[in-house]
Design a protein with these regions (language model features):
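N-terminal targeting signals for export/organelle localization
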Residues: 1-51
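Structural beta-sheet core signal
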Residues: 71, 102-105, 155
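Thiol/disulfide oxidoreductase modules built on the thioredoxin-like
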Residues: 135-176
Length: 190
């Protein structure tokens, strides 16, 4: 008799755990937010849909397994703070600095000369021209803020999916925590 009760308790414990946790989340006890400190896009999107001007290769290659911090520049004065912050976040990763790539996208021909100056100022940054502006359109549709006005930093995972962006008011230390808790860094100070 004791063995049957013990066996029943062992067999029912996992079922009860799953049942109670499901009920806990179903009846409104789920967490309100996430700890990523960013804002998820309405729908994540793959970057392999964006091609270069000749339509023969991807706008960005993701074969190196690096996380990507990006800014879409529409106004150089608005975006310079985001570009500088990307550099500071990259430097703050210390020995994991090579696990992150920084990319600046733009489509306005009037910014060509400013992009050359930007490349001189930040030599390790990759600058990509989105000739037809389709990336900007997709960013606008999938976000809750105006990418044209704000020029925020957005994150692309190593598989080529744009998953989140950061509001311009987000504390840089919180952004760094996301990079530390992802595969972009080995040591986690957060």
């Amino acid at each position: 008799m004791k063995n049957k009760i013990f066996l029943a308790a062992i067999l029912l414990t996992p079922i009860l755990v799953v049942l109670f946790s499901s009920m806990y989340f179903t009846f409104g006890m789920s967490p309100d937010g996430t700890k990523n400190n960013g804002v998820f896009f309405n729908n994540y999107f793959e970057f392999n849909q964006f091609k270069n001007a000749e339509e023969n290769r991807d706008l960005v290659e993701f074969e190196d397994g690096k996380w990507v911090l990006s800014v879409y520049v529409t106004n150089m004065d608005k975006s310079i703070e985001s570009i500088y912050l990307m550099r500071q976040l990259n430097v703050a990763l210390n020995r994991d600095i090579n696990k992150l790539k920084r990319i600046v996208f733009y489509s306005d021909n009037a910014l060509d000369i400013k992009m050359i100056d930007l490349q001189d100022q930040y030599p390790r940054i990759e600058i990509i021209k989105d000739k037809n502006g389709t990336l900007l359109d997709v960013l606008q549709v999938n976000s809750n803020i105006s990418f044209i006005k704000e020029n925020p930093i957005f994150v692309i995972d190593p598989y080529g999916r744009a998953v989140m962006y950061f509001d311009p008011e987000t504390d840089p230390k919180l952004m760094l925590c996301l990079l530390y808790t992802s595969d972009a860094a080995d040591d986690t100070p957060c």
